């Protein structure tokens, strides 16, 4: 099997990042916003792995492990916040919760 060209991989990473960014900006549900952030982090990790494989450096894989660890921590903290948010407001709509504050 041949290697994936850098341009093709970066196009996929850019599309994934754009989809995640779109999800963060458009969706108002806190859970979907959290999933969109995860997609954006995975797109960045994909770009690091591709760059590391093109230049035959292990730095891309090291950054992938770091981003994966950061994404796991962000998911745990984010889900805890989502649970508290739901218990307090009984919905996950970010705009409605900001209006309740006054």
Swiss-Prot record:
The chain crosses the membrane at residues 6-26, 30-50, 62-82. One of its GO terms (cellular component) is NADH dehydrogenase complex. Its EC number is 7.1.1.-. It is a multi-pass membrane protein. GO terms for molecular function: NADH:ubiquinone reductase (non-electrogenic) activity; quinone binding. Keywords: Cell inner membrane, Cell membrane, Membrane, NAD, Quinone, Translocase, Transmembrane, Transmembrane helix, Transport, Ubiquinone. The keyword Cell inner membrane applies. It catalyses: a quinone + NADH + 5 H(+)(in) = a quinol + NAD(+) + 4 H(+)(out). It holds the Pfam family Oxidored_q2. It is found in: Cell inner membrane. NCBIfam families: PRK05715.1-1, PRK05715.1-2. NDH-1 is composed of 14 different subunits. Subunits NuoA, H, J, K, L, M, N constitute the membrane sector of the complex. PANTHER family: NADH-UBIQUINONE OXIDOREDUCTASE CHAIN 4L, NADH-UBIQUINONE OXIDOREDUCTASE SUBUNIT ND4L. Belongs to the complex I subunit 4L family. This is NADH-quinone oxidoreductase subunit K.
